[in-house]
Amino acid sequence: MDSAAPSPLQRIDQDLFDAVAAAAAGSPRRRRNHNFHAPSDRVQRFLNVLQPGTYVRPHRHRRAQPGDGFECFLVLQGAVGLLLLDAKGRVLQRERISAAGPLRGIELAEGVIHTLVALSPDAVMMEIKQGPYEPAADKDFLPGFPLEGSEAAAAQEAAWRALFGPGDDHLSPAHPLP
């Protein structure tokens, strides 16, 4: 599921959502990507399916190549919480992004430290960002946060998920982003 399909037309339908969600549920990481791009493509396009309990270590993207290193998230099924953090790991802003709205997607500028939490089972996001994909340089992780798979990571994910109460569709920042 992680490689691009050779077909000139790639369907984005419920069958695909269900297949990738099942793979995510069976994964120790509790998430799975389905790429529509080749690693060398100038634009990365993929589904990112998250299950509750997945831990996304806080990170930012910095590009070595010229261009705008944006990241665009559009939730197609379920709900996801986005947290923007400062350099010390403090939450600056929380956003509930949901296929049921009112906020269904965001575009995030390069260099912004962030993490995601699954707020529903089988949460499906379409992500678009500038390529090519360079695994060694894709993410700059924020120091001081636990590694994936640890008990501390599970506790951190639960604490972040608790920041999103039921029905909190948009929570304003405590203070503006730098």
Language model regions located:
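Double-stranded beta-helix
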Residues: 90, 115-178
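Short acidic-glycine-tyrosine-enriched beta hairpin
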Residues: 86-114
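Short solvent-exposed loop/turn micro-motifs enriched in small/polar/acidic residues
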Residues: 40-41, 65-67, 99, 108-110
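His/acidic/aromatic-lined binding-pocket segments of jelly-roll/cupin-type domains
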Residues: 46-48, 65-66, 70-75, 106, ...
